[in-house]
Amino acid sequence: MANQMALWLDREGAAEMSCIAGVGGGVISLVRTAQSRRPILALDGCVLKCVSACLSNAGVSADTLLVLSDYDVKKCKHADFDPVQAVEVYARAVLPAALALRGGDERWARAAATGDAPTDRVATHAT
């Protein structure tokens, strides 16, 4: 689910997705991108916080860390994530956090602070 949300952010132009496995694996160009001092939104799927660990290995910490299990997202083995839940968490937490890091318009900044995101920007993601 975290990967899908990162793709949505990238496709909407709200954030640029980067390969966290490459950062954790020490791929020079990806580590440089992570260390470039651009704001970083880390989307960790569960309490293991693998994204945070990969960033830490590169000497970087996220400006904003969202752990999807904090939003009642359960880890699924051998099954797809719940698309309805994904859209809901994306609209309520992920997109507002990304836009707040970018200095998004006032409505999105309020949404990030209250967790009450407008849904018009994510309607195309409902399946």
Regions found by a protein language model. Give the residues of each.
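Iron-sulfur-associated redox domains of electron-transfer enzymes in respiratory
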Residues: 1-125
